[in-house]
Amino acid sequence: MYNLKVKKLNDDAIIPNFAHKGDAGMDLYSIEEVVIPPGETKLIKTGICIELPTMTEAQVRPRSGLALKHSVTVLNTPGTIDEGYRGELKIILINHGKNDFKVEKHMKIAQMIVKPIYDINIEEVKELSDSERGKGGFGSTGF
């Protein structure tokens, strides 16, 4: 088991938590009230900083309920939090709906998943090996 260290920047901040045992994503909470007009984005503060375990990253993903019920989602999904980042976690939300959306203080606004990463050596080559797929992409397998 890995430990995720969390520092509150504000006494009102909520520590990320899992809604159910076995969930992959832990909920992230807003520390402020913000209105997001239709078609606009806002950067929402969480009031926390984290220290990830060695050789991991955190991915910030949307909450399905916000997307389905309010057409509000995380804009850069998944958002990547690198292991060495120690600043406040902030979530970019976009309102695809037709009405203003009010982010309430302590509202669940996104979920965060901690994933392992690999130590990668980048090697420039003249040629790549062949594969069954080759260069096929962008609908090449049909619709």
UniProtKB/Swiss-Prot annotation:
Substrate binds at R63, S64, G65, N76, T80, I81, D82, K90. One of its GO terms (biological process) is dUTP catabolic process. One of its GO terms (molecular function) is magnesium ion binding. The keyword Transport does not apply. Keywords: Hydrolase, Magnesium, Metal-binding, Nucleotide metabolism. It holds the Pfam family dUTPase. The keyword Hydrolase applies. Pathway: Pyrimidine metabolism; dUMP biosynthesis; dUMP from dCTP (dUTP route): step 2/2. Its EC number is 3.6.1.23. This enzyme is involved in nucleotide metabolism: it produces dUMP, the immediate precursor of thymidine nucleotides and it decreases the intracellular concentration of dUTP so that uracil cannot be incorporated into DNA. Belongs to the dUTPase family. This is Deoxyuridine 5'-triphosphate nucleotidohydrolase. The gene is dut.
